[in-house]
Structures are given as structure tokens and as C-alpha cells.
Amino acid sequence: MKKNILKILKKNKIKDEEENIIVDSLEFIRLIVDLEESYKIKFDDEDLIFENFSSINRIIEIIKKRKLLNYKNYLNQKIKVKVDRKLGDKHPEYEYIYSLNYGYIPNTKSEDGEEIDVYILGEFDPLEEFEGVCRAIIYRVDDIENKLIVTAEDKKYSIDQIKALVEFQERFFKTEIIMEK
């Protein structure tokens, strides 16, 4: 494992001139857990020093909570969504069908290095694109990705309704739903 990670570091040249490891994904930080050495890691323009990897989960949780603040900026805002998994599509890796339209906000970046993911509620036809209002955040406590809930301007859902509608995928994660009051 250690050799593989070091190969990735060298291959992708993600060390700066001071030999700090520079990452843009919390997932990559998780890969470094098994290294026995101490490393200074730069994430989101902040230095993180790992000398004892037993505390990495706590540090990742702190980073995630800080990142959650960025998601809160989307609450009650109009958002344009590009749909990449339409209502009725099969998940590309797992054996379930999307019971709603699912996509992303173009030109954004989430913790996994991809665009910010979005569930679209209340639309009952497969869509290519959608413009709506962000009503909630699905905060995945045990994963690096969070999701946004977007609806048409005239539609609102309770926390229980949101949980039921996204259960097909979110049942695999420990989540909290965050909404403005």
C-alpha cells in the first residue's frame, strides 16, 4: 500500500517545492492513512500535519464540517443542474434504479474532486437539465460527499419526505438533512 501511494504521489507530481503533499480530495487523504511516515499535506490552501494517523478520521470530520459551510451558501438559491442520471436510469455500478433525476452543478467542485451532486425532487419525467431552488443539504456523516436537494420554486418538502425520496441511495450512508428554518 505504502509503495503504491508513493508511486501515485510521484506519478502525479503532487508535491510542492518544499516536499509538501498537495491534495484536492479528502479521498486521497484517506489513502495516506496507512503510511508510517509523517507528512505535511496541503488541502484547500491549509497545511495539515499528520504525525499520528490514528487521528485522521477526526481531522477529516473537522474539514468536512468546514466544507459544509460552502454548501450552506446554496440554500434557497436558484441553481442550474445538469442531469447525468435520469429518472429510471440504472446506477452505473450498483443494482438499483434512480427514482428521481440526479445530476450536478457544472463548474463546481466537491470533496471528491467532482462537481457538487444534486437530487431533483418533484419532477416526474426524465430530464436533461433543470433549474430550481436548493431546499436542503444531505450531509453524509460517514462519507466525503454531500448532496443538495433542488426543487421547483413552488415546491417544498419536509425532512421526512426528503429522507423517503432519497432512501434508494442514501440508505447506505449515515446522513443528516440540513434545511433553513
What kind of feature is each model-predicted range?
Residues 1-16, 64-67:
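Thiotemplate assembly-line natural product biosynthesis machinery
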Residues 3, 26-29:
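Short alpha-helical elements of helix-turn-helix
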Residues 57-70:
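Charged low-complexity stretches with an acidic bias
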Residues 69-181:
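Hydrophobic N-terminal alpha-helices or hydrophobic patches in metabolic proteins across all domains
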